[in-house]
Every structure is written in C-alpha cells, then in structure tokens.
Design a protein with these regions (language model features):
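C-terminal segment of N-terminal export signals and the immediately downstream linker at the start
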Residues: 1, 18-48
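N-terminal secretory signal peptides and thylakoid transit peptides that target proteins
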Residues: 1-13
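Short, flexible active-site loop motifs that bind/organize anionic cofactors or intermediates
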Residues: 13, 33, 51, 125, ...
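A generic secondary-structure boundary signal that marks alpha-helix termini
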Residues: 15-19, 147
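N-terminal mature-domain "stem" immediately C-terminal to a signal peptide or N-terminal signal-anchor/transmembrane
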Residues: 34-69
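Catalytic glycan-binding domains that act on GlcNAc-containing polysaccharides
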Residues: 58-242
Length: 242
C-alpha cells in the first residue's frame, strides 16, 4: 500500500506538468509537400549543413529523407484545439487527466514494475540519487510501463515537423539530425524505429538528442536498449534527471 501511495503522488506531480500547450503550426505550400523532400531548397541546405557537421554522406541522407512521407495528421495533433466563441471548452482539466493517469490498471502495473525492477531502481538511487518513485512515475505517464510506446514512424514524424511545421522547425531539425546520426552509427533501417507523433521513442519516450546524451547500459549486456530493457530505461531516466 505504501508503494501505491507513493506512486500516486509521483504520477500526480508528473501528469500535472504533461499538459503543456503546443504552439500552432504554419503549413508549407501544397506544391512543396508534393515534392520529394531532398529537392526542396530548405532540405537541400539542411542536408549540406548536417553532412558537413557530422561527416555523413549527402547521398545517403538525401535517400533517407526521400523515404519519409508527409503526415498531415501530425500537424493537427501538434496544434492545440481551442474552443470557438460560444462553445464549450473541451480541453482536459486536471480532474480528467487524473482519471487517465491514476486509474487502477496503470497503478497496478506500476506496483508490479516496481517489484520486478527493484534491484535496478535501487542502483539508480545509489548512483544517480534519483527516487525510484519518480522513475516509476515517468514510465507510467509516458508509456504505461511499455504498453504504448507509439506506432508512428519516427522518420515521418521528425521530417514532417522539421519542414512542414514551421513554428517549431528549428527544434525538430536538431532532433532529426541526431536521429540520422543514430541510424547511421547503428546501421538501422529508418522505418524500424517507431515512436510518438513528436518523434519520441522507447519506454521513457526520449527524443533522439536525449538518447545520445543520457543513455545508460544498466544491465551490462554491452547494448543500450530503451525499447525493451527495463534496466537500461531506468538507468537512462536516472542519468537524465541527475
């Protein structure tokens, strides 16, 4: 019961900050969206700059980007819904979010996850001085302990948000650059990687720049896997927060 109470407190605090409003998008022209990405002037410059900075092959990067498909739904999802004058505001308040994040199913999953991973959680506390309840709360809020890590193709997400969602293009271009480096260094096929519509991946829903910066091989198997390894996920979150 103590762990359940601590978990409720941890998730409540995290979920309260999760409802940040996302800025409205500014769409590119239809003509641009119908064109292969590598032929668009803005993308050509991006390719040149990234390859110069990171030592990647321009033809390889262009070929990867041309496999991406513009996703209009992602633009819609990134745009907050605002109530029209005279209509009811349907945005969720804390009470509605509380029912989502503190339901019995999620809490039971959290308690079991804590039991199953207690060794790694205590190691994270010792090494990074991060309370296990905070780590548990983050994984619960982000992916429901791995039940929903996202089904969007991350390449589609990041390319759409870099070149067709102008309001936050600079941020997503940096994430796309890091994603391309991850693909190149790990010999991954672009559509093998799935995640959220914003391009976050794995149990902790890290953006590519965070993966590079804080990833931790916490189970000592020589690999860092935040998609399947709860140990690596715990270590990486703790490293991120330390």
């Amino acid at each position: 019961m103590l762990r359940r109470s601590i978990l409720i407190s941890g998730i409540s605090g995290l979920a309260a900050f999760s409802g940040l409003a996302l800025a409205q998008s500014m769409s590119s022209s239809s003509a641009e969206k119908a064109m292969p990405y590598s032929r668009r002037p803005e993308v050509k410059k991006f390719i040149q700059d990234v390859c110069k900075r990171r030592g990647l092959d321009q033809n390889w990067v262009a070929a990867i980007l041309d496999q991406a498909t513009y996703q209009p739904k992602i633009e819609r999802l990134m745009t907050p819904k605002r109530a029209k004058p005279g209509t009811k505001d349907t945005r969720k308040d804390w009470e509605k979010y509380r029912n989502i994040f503190l339901g019995a199913h999620r809490l039971n999953l959290g308690v079991q996850f804590w039991k199953d991973n207690e060794v790694y959680l205590e190691r994270a506390r010792e090494i990074y001085h991060v309370d296990p309840a905070v780590i548990i709360g983050i994984i619960g809020v982000e992916t429901r302990y791995g039940e929903n890590t996202g089904s969007w193709k991350v390449l589609d997400s990041l390319v759409t948000l870099s070149f067709d969602y102008k309001r936050r293009a600079d941020f997503f271009k940096k994430e796309l650059e890091e994603f391309l480096v991850i693909l190149y260094n790990n010999d991954l096929k672009p559509f093998e990687v799935q995640g959220s519509y914003a391009g976050a991946v794995g149990l902790p829903q890290f953006m590519p720049s965070s993966i590079k910066r804080v990833r931790a091989d916490f189970d000592g198997d020589g690999k860092i896997d935040i998609n399947h390894s709860t140990a690596d996920t715990i270590g990486s979150i703790a490293n991120y927060l330390s």
